[in-house]
Design a protein with these regions (language model features):
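Sec-dependent bacterial lipoprotein signal peptides
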Residues: 1-17
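OB-fold and OB-like single-stranded nucleic-acid-recognition modules
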Residues: 18-173
């Protein structure tokens, strides 16, 4: 009987320990939501500059078009807002064969990220930030390559934020 109880306890522990959690991060769909479609361009905007170049040259309140890859940290998306960080495509992210569970955090090249990262917040026509999850709203995910159009703002440390009115998601990237 003790053996049977012990086996039952082991099986119960296994079943409970391997259960799925009800709490999960929103995931991207391959398409933007109906609410997000108004912010997503169907053709790629011309003359996009990489994030690193934009950080060097963009002036405060200047209209910009830049290209980057979503990432830069383990959590590049801002909870509750359609906002995220992008990194210059020239900065390599960790590859699958390096065994990195979160290659979008650029843990292998963090020294290169600082001068090649920008924050993107999707805004409406009045410049008000859009609430919701960017993954669902825009159909993006970590390491998606995006082309952003919007207005640049700079802080005292030289950080670049873009109030984006248009987002183009490069297919297959």
């Amino acid at each position: 009987m003790k053996v049977l109880n012990g086996m039952f306890l082991c099986v119960l522990t296994l079943v409970v320990g391997c259960g799925t959690s009800d709490v999960s991060a929103p995931v991207a769909s391959s398409q933007p939501s109906p609410e997000g479609a108004q912010f997503v361009a169907t053709t790629e905007p011309a003359n996009a500059v990489p994030v690193g170049t934009a950080r060097e040259s963009a002036q405060d309140e200047q209209e910009v078009t830049l290209v980057g890859r979503i990432g830069g940290s383990t959590e590049p998306f801002v909870n509750g807002l359609a906002a995220f960080t992008i990194v210059d495509p020239k900065v390599p992210h960790c590859s699958a064969d390096e065994g990195c569970p979160t290659p979008w955090d650029y843990c292998c090249t963090q020294d290169q990220v600082k001068g090649n990262i920008a924050t993107v917040k999707v805004v409406d026509g009045a410049g008000k930030p859009i609430t919701g999850d960017a993954r669902q709203l825009l159909g993006v995910k970590e390491l998606s390559t995006v082309v952003i159009q919007g207005k640049a703002t700079r802080d005292d440390q030289g950080n670049l934020t873009v109030a984006a009115t248009t987002v183009f998601v490069r297919p297959g990237e």
